[in-house]
């Protein structure tokens, strides 16, 4: 504080000296802090002038000190005014002012200090006196942001003092309260109470609700409890004063209304114009209880939806052109209310069309957006859960709308008198013919739009985190509520209630025709998918943020599925279109059934034509597994390789030698099943719940059912030995297909069992020993990888294979090598393909690996074999010799990655994908029992040759000789 702050009262005190107990009281003259501080502040003129000051940080600090220095609570009126000044300053300046006066931002937002410096929770607070408050109010006349509000407060203060005489004793308060209740009209449904007017300032006559203490922009546009608890006489006189300054309202952005203005209250006033005029003049104020204020606030919020309710009649009368209407959302003016409504519905209103998925409450402004959302199979978009506060408010408003439609006329507020309003020329009427504000009396009120009055408060936006804000009881509507979350049946508050169900919007005048087209398009796109596995589920796991916002523009249009037609029409359209809906729905159902049957037959024919010719060409030796028949087993790598070897040419070649595979009889029997039954079974099981086996019309309905019914059921990993569980199948499948997460489980299982899943692999090695036992294998440094271009729905596969030796190639070579069968991963490999296009994956991309292979101390480099621990017989040679049918495929055939099921157009793109994503599958430590995997041969060899890393491992098992 300044060193010389003298007292303004007639005393000899030259400098303010804070008291030891009460810091706001001077120890020398016993006068208060405000009496001294006013000596440093400019006294505004008594009569209002047009000259105002610019808000500056140092001036705001001086005025803030009048109410914050040495106090623990702020009067409500002064906090309103100070908020206006703070909103003009930067947030850093506001924080500096508060901290200099020993106030935190949380306490200032709350309006009082919660705990003292020692941490004790306060139960009583020091606050400035009423005389100091009046003196401080005058300082706010200096600024244009607060001048008009202070003038209204002064008028209210003057009339309150002239009308109400304070009681002399405390017992008279109860007597006066009872007597005032006796004179109250029976037409008012809510009990009102003036309380003890002498001991309570009208602006402190608020309900005990913390919502008023939060920053203004957290409400839309005003705390509901505050609206319901305002003294009516004050609000009426506020509007009267505002009506006398229309020109100032046009030019001054901050001076057209006080903070306590509200559109919802204005609309309720419209409904009260026909109230009986026999109500006594004593009913000039109302203090609503906590319980009633919430229900009233709910009604008041819902009245602000429609453009008719949002258009301010005073703005219409003050517009540049007579008859133009004003959109409060974007500040644009329009020729008439019809044009405004079209603009409002198209730009600002997003509540026209409800999602057709059962249980989803999302609503949209256009059918296209609604259909795009409804066709998305992601169940998280349709779950009846609280996505955020906006959706919660939307659902609450929807429930309130349905329950309050027929019991609206419960809340009325009677204005003291109903004469013509001075200062407004001409009558303003709404679209339904009811007078809007033309008959409000001299004490009537007009509440201008709060949006132009209340600026954005920067000091509330950035520094205050949600955790710092007060935990406020009661309903706290979020910002987007009134602009986008109220159903259409509340669009016009002043129209008769019996006419509400008949109101239709322009966009939904022909809903059946549009929905039929959307259903047909969705049905075509749904059947274009080959199987359910190809449909992206888009299920976001629980630990991932959901970035599918209710804004439907982000939903891909490719994921349309069949729309559900059982969803009832909105309340406003049900009565008018019930008969047409029934007829059209029946026709649609029949059309969809015929379309489904026709497309099923076409799919069956395609499936037959794709399977039968190949069986005839191969003489029945080659077995083809369609996409629907690929076994879903815990070890996809080994089992799929086994099935393809045994179902392909290798099985036929070995069978010609008289070797039998008794355990593969089941795979032979599968071939005798009718393709018609298989295709039909696949089609029926496409949309079947895996848990309860219920069938659904489309994938979206099935996913929604799974989330709503089986939400708590987890999906366990399909790999045996892995106990991981996931909340969604998509997360489970993504985890199960990642072999890097299951290397330990896979290798342990491979070592423990030789009869379970790998019997074919072990048997193949025994067969190789018997058939080629006279051949001597010469070890050489080489490593290859084989791509089998199979013809099943799974596409081609890639597997790491063991050593390939040049001597064995020469011994086995009874014919030319299969073209395109072997793709060399190493530049030092002795095996080359005849075709240059299939010779190598990347000659320079793996040069490091080829060089690293020569660094082995023992002269050879063992790759990961088909069966762990037994890797000396070149199975790839057997496969190349036996499966001649694989070589006949064209080189440009799309390649499917066996690990992630992605399809690539050529070897180049597949090679790049496999080496960058799945290369860890190729290089395993050579020490038996060590399951460490490496991305390069050099790293693997360096690890394998380090004995210190394998001390704890048991001795390696003997290899086959």
UniProtKB/Swiss-Prot annotation:
Keywords for the protein's UniProt record, in alphabetical order: Cytoplasm, Differentiation, DNA-binding, Metal-binding, Nucleus, Phosphoprotein, Repeat, Spermatogenesis, Transcription, Transcription regulation, Zinc, Zinc-finger
Transport as UniProt keyword: no
Modification after translation (UniProt): Phosphorylation on Ser-505 and Ser-509 leads to cytoplasmic localization.
GO cellular component terms listed in the entry, alphabetical order: cytoplasm; nucleolus; nucleoplasm; nucleus
One GO-annotated biological process of the protein: wound healing
Localisation per UniProt entry: Nucleus; Cytoplasm; Nucleus, Nucleoplasm
Ranges of compositional bias, category Low complexity: 826-844
Zn finger residue spans: C2H2-type: 325-348, 353-382, 687-711, 715-743, 895-918, 923-950
Positions carrying Phosphoserine: 505, 509
Region (Disordered): 370-393, 523-572, 810-864, 937-961
UniProt feature coiled coil, ranges: none
Tissue expression notes: Epidermis and germ cells of testis and ovary.
Acyltransferase as UniProt keyword: no
Annotated InterPro entries: Disconnected-like, Znf_C2H2_sf, Znf_C2H2_type
GO terms assigned for molecular function: DNA binding; zinc ion binding
Principal location: nucleus
Ranges of biased composition (kind: Acidic residues): 531-547
Intervals of motif Nuclear localization signal: 501-507
Compositional bias segments (type: Basic and acidic residues): 548-560
UniProt note: phenotype after gene disruption: Viable, although fertility is severely reduced in both males and females. Males have significantly reduced testis size, with progressive degeneration of seminiferous epithelium and loss of germ cells from 8 weeks of age. Sperm motility is also reduced.
Region entry Hydrophobic, spans: 210-219
Function: Transcriptional activator. It is likely involved in the regulation of keratinocytes terminal differentiation in squamous epithelia and hair follicles. Required for the maintenance of spermatogenesis. It is involved in the positive regulation of oocyte maturation, probably acting through the control of BMP15 levels and regulation of AKT signaling cascade. May also play a role in the early development of embryos.
Oligomer status and interactors: Interacts with HSF2BP (via C-terminus).
Protein name: Zinc finger protein basonuclin-1
Encoding gene (name): Bnc1
């Amino acid at each position: 504080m300044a060193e010389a702050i003298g007292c303004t009262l007639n005393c000899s005190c030259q400098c303010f000296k804070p008291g030891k107990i009460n810091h706001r009281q001077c120890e020398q003259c016993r006068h208060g802090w405000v009496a001294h501080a006013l000596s440093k502040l400019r006294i505004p003129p008594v009569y209002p002038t047009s000259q105002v000051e610019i808000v500056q940080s140092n001036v705001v600090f001086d005025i803030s000190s009048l109410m914050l220095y040495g106090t623990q609570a702020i009067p409500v009126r002064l906090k309103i005014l100070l908020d206006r000044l703070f909103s003009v300053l930067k947030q850093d300046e506001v924080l500096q002012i508060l901290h200099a006066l020993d106030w935190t931002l949380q306490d200032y937002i709350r309006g009082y200090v919660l705990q003292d410096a020692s941490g004790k929770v306060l139960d009583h607070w020091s606050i400035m006196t009423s005389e100091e408050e009046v003196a401080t109010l005058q300082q706010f006349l200096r600024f244009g942001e607060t001048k008009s509000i202070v003038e209204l407060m002064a008028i209210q203060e003057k009339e309150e003092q002239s009308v109400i005489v304070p009681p002399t004793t405390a017992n008279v308060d109860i007597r006066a309260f009872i007597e005032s209740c006796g004179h109250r009209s029976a037409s008012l449904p809510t009990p009102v109470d003036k309380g003890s007017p002498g001991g309570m300032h009208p602006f402190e006559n608020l309900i005990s609700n913390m919502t008023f203490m939060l920053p203004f922009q957290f409400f839309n546009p005003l705390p509901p409890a505050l609206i319901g608890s305002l003294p009516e006489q004050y609000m009426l006189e506020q509007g009267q004063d505002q009506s006398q300054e229309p020109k100032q309202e046009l030019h001054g952005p901050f001076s057209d209304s006080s903070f306590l203005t509200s559109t919802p209250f204005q609309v309720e006033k419209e409904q009260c114009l026909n109230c009986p005029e026999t109500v006594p003049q004593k009913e000039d104020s109302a203090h609503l209880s906590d319980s009633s204020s919430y229900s009233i606030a709910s009604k008041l919020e819902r009245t602000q939806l429609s453009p008719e309710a949002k258009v301010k009649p005073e703005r219409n009368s003050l517009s540049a052109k007579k008859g133009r209407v004003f959109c409060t959302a974007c500040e644009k003016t329009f020729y008439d209310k019809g044009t405004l409504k079209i603009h409002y519905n198209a730009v600002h209103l997003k509540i026209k069309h409800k999602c057709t998925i059962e249980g989803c409450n999302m609503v949209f402004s256009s059918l296209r957006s609604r259909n795009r959302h409804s066709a998305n199979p992601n169940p998280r978009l349709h779950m009846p859960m609280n996505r955020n506060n906006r959706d919660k408010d939307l659902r609450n408003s929807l429930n309130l709308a349905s329950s309050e439609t027929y019991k609206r006329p419960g809340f009325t507020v009677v204005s003291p008198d109903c004469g013509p309003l001075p200062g407004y020329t001409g009558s303003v009427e709404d679209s339904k013919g009811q007078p809007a504000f033309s008959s409000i009396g001299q004490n009537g009120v007009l509440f201008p739009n709060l949006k132009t009055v209340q600026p954005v408060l920067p000091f509330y936006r950035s520094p205050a985190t949600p955790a710092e804000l007060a935990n406020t009881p009661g309903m706290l509507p979020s910002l987007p509520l009134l602009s986008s979350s109220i159903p259409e049946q509340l669009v016009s508050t002043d129209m008769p209630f019996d006419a509400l169900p008949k109101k239709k919007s322009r966009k939904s005048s022909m809903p059946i025709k549009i929905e039929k087209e959307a259903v047909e398009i969705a049905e075509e796109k749904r059947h274009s998918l080959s199987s359910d596995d190809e449909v992206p589920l888009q299920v976001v796991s629980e630990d991932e943020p959901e970035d599918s916002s209710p804004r439907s523009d982000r939903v891909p249009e490719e994921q349309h599925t069949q729309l559900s037609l059982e969803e009832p029409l909105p309340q406003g359209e049900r009565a008018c279109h019930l008969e047409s809906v029934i007829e059209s729905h029946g026709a649609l159902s029949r059309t969809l059934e015929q379309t489904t049957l026709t497309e099923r037959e076409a799919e069956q024919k395609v499936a037959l034509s794709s399977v039968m010719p190949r069986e005839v060409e191969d003489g029945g030796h080659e077995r083809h597994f369609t996409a629907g028949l690929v076994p879903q087993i815990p070890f996809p790598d080994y089992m799929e390789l086994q099935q393809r070897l045994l179902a392909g040419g290798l099985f036929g070649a070995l069978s010609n030698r008289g070797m039998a595979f008794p355990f593969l009889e089941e795979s032979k029997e599968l071939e005798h099943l009718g393709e018609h039954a298989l295709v039909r079974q696949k089609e029926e099981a496409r949309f079947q719940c895996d848990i309860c086996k219920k069938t659904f019309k489309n994938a979206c309905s099935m996913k929604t059912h799974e989330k709503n019914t089986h939400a708590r059921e987890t999906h366990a990993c399909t790999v045996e030995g892995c106990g991981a569980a996931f909340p969604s199948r998509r997360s489970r499948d993504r985890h199960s297909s990642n072999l890097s997460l299951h290397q330990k489980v896979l290798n342990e299982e491979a070592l423990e069992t030789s009869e379970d899943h790998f019997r074919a692999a072990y048997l193949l090695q025994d067969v190789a020993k018997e058939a080629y036992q006279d051949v001597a294998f010469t070890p050489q440094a080489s490593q290859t990888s084989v791509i089998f271009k199979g013809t099943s729905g799974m596409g081609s596969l890639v597997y790491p294979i063991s050593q390939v030796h040049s001597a064995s190639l020469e011994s086995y070579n009874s014919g030319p090598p299969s073209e395109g069968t072997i793709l060399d991963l190493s530049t030092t490999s002795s095996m080359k393909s005849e075709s240059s296009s299939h010779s190598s994956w990347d000659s320079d991309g793996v040069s490091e690996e080829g060089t690293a292979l020569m660094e082995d101390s023992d002269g050879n480099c063992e790759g990961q074999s088909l069966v762990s621990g037994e890797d000396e017989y070149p199975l790839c040679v057997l496969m190349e010799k036996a499966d001649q049918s694989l070589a006949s495929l064209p080189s440009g055939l799309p390649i499917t990655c066996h690990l992630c099921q992605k399809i690539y157009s050529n070897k180049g793109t597949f090679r790049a994908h496999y080496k960058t994503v799945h290369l860890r599958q190729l290089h395993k430590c050579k020490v038996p029992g060590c399951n460490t995997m490496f991305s390069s041969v050099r790293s693997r060899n360096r690890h394998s040759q380090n004995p210190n890393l394998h001390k704890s491992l048991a001795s390696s098992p003997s290899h086959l000789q």
